[in-house]
């Protein structure tokens, strides 16, 4: 399948020109800006950041990254700004429709984990509300910020961002007029102080736990509070606070039940059933509102910026005040810091892909997507809520948890599955610290929840409530067996033995647990739930088997490095046995692929008969790489079966325009029949699901790359699919954000669905299918710093001539790589910075190519030809900081 070309030119500019407005891009320190943080001076109504101050920051306009803009259907698109302690979601006109489905209609607005603060904040100029009475002309997404432009006699550029380390969101309005004006500026805010758990359908539910908010006015700010003890057994007393205010002193205020700007009176979403096409609030909401009014003098032709902050805390009003003051004291300084941090992220893993500029741009934005996914919460009260059926007393407290939020708006919390896949993208992007913190959080929660059994919790809300993943839950086997592999992944990319040692005991207990509790028939194939659960599946799942094989090899490697011969031998013996029996047990000739599961529980005589249902997990034997001592790293699948299975998955019964279906089409006993192509004769017991998740597509992209299949009809189909849903204006919802699900035959595009019935606007796991294929497979970066070595063996994709990457982080150093393929010559140029490791460089030969000569730094050199899953690799020992390899082909 050939990738479809992008329909419209990607809207991009080479710097955040207009981060605040055309003249106010980044706030640099200058004589015109406040020198210190702190609350604004109290006194003069009408004090603003004036045009002189705005002009002083123009020099910062080139220090940020690129921008993506949208001008069409802005009211149908979700907006998102994120920091590690707060985030906000509305639409791209600056309004705040009721959003999300975990607590229907309540997942948007302003949040600071684990607490929602506001349904929204609305701005009116001289009685005209921005986003409704004054239409939004353009929405722009940048690296760590967003901007909405409005026209009118007084033009407005609204810039939102969330400073990291602060429980607040900042909004800057930059006003500009051709004539002198005094503008009446109204700001409405509607509170909804509500924890991220319980949800709408759980017991107790969100409405039962939520208490009425109260509103007050003091010292120029609106203050909203919710305090008391909910009438729920085991609920604790709380004192939630949200504050709204400005760098400008208000001339008036009002309090009342509404104050939703143009969204009054509110359309209320029901708890369930069919919602209206548009809602403003939910039946669970118990918030209140307020208004602040300002008088702003706008000088002719000179921009005037007014800042607003939404801050809060689940601790106390005093804590909320501290967060508010940190935010509003010097917004420009915080904006500068945000831009500087995002520029540093952009500078790591900087790639040059002249043969695939769309993928290059996807690498850029995927790094930002990862940074946008970082969340942190404090004092998590760990309790097993048993899939929403109970609410026991907490078993303990995790003081601090930091993680990659799975997806916004409905999943911005701690998941094992998501974090484990996302870690591969994170190391490729150089974002080691959050990946480490994610694993620590999983360990800390899991050990409290499961009494140190070794089982990994699946889904943990920022309150500490664990929806699934306790010892009594039926499985999440795959997440538990993947954990040692992610520890090993980070150890190999960082060489951090302390981190290895910190997580080693838990990793050992992971695999001891699954053999003790999830192999009741002692056949070595683990029981329990995994990534896919559908009717008719056997109790032993393919993906759990694959990731167990990888986990055993990785645990053995960790054990060997610690001289733990007992665990090394135990894990190696288990892995050897599993790998010897795998192909015979799981391969199905008639399906041209692997069984999804074995051992039908409804048929005791099943005796491990394979069950084939065409799920995406059938690709995992080709996706997961196994590290075996003395052998090249390779997937579990045999090369012969991998070629057959990958060829099959590229066909229309499995692959659509944007990537891999969740469940392929073909003969089925399901009453709904087969809606698509048939590529085999096996009769499945379930219907197809032609929904294209960005994770499924990532799995396929990685699997293709593991076997050197980088061509236009192979890996590039899937890397292009994920890049397009993130960057193609004909496809995206939120510019630059990797979504959870692509527009698919069985999953229509989000933009046409109600805000309460959408998949995630930003989902971290899709970055796996962009960053890992480029860095690990195309650029060939394969560190093993735990053992003091690194291999850099690139493969230029078919139809291309060059791939390059710089500042690819390895441990405390980095590597630059350039690979070229032209005529009969392959060139690999490598520069190592700050690494004390043995370095091997090389290249993957084109299929059928033969070597005539090899030189290193201009001199003939010895080399090895190594047969790997990717193909034949030329490998050469490199010395020094820079190496230049030339391979001449016959």
Indicate where each model-derived feature is located.
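Polysaccharide-binding surfaces and accessory modules of carbohydrate-active proteins
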Residues: 55-63, 147, 152-265, 290-292, ...
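Short Pro-Gly-centered flexible turn/kink motifs
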Residues: 134-137, 173, 181-185, 295-319, ...
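Active-site acid/base region of carbohydrate-active enzymes
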Residues: 235-260, 354-391, 429, 438-457, ...
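Secretory targeting and sorting signals
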Residues: 1-44
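Non-catalytic C-terminal accessory modules of carbohydrate-active enzymes
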Residues: 117, 124-159, 699, 706-890
